[in-house]
Amino acid sequence: MTFEPQMPNWGLIEFEQHKEKLVNYHDWLYTTGIKTGLISKKPKQFIWDEFIVHSLYFHHLIKKYNFKSKEIYDLGTGGGIPGVPISIVNKRKVNLIDNKKTRIYEL
């Protein structure tokens, strides 16, 4: 079965503008993220739908409610979810915070 990333209408513009980086992060989660224990073993489509798309919905809300000037903190980031996808499409600093140093070093 071939993995093909898809995006709901609310995220199509950002997806098209940042597709390569988002897919690269997805692939990193699927390989390194699973291997190092940042995320549990999941199918590629699940990782895309549940981690990437859901993360980008936060970006959609940031735009919708005009929170662009606010600082963003991802508490308990684990594998960088939702912080990394948000920072990819938002092109701004997202503070990734986790209580396990190994997770932060891996990111």
Model regions: which residues?
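Class I SAM-dependent transferase core
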Residues: 2-3, 7-67, 73, 105
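Conserved SAM/SAH cofactor-binding pocket of Class I
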Residues: 56-107
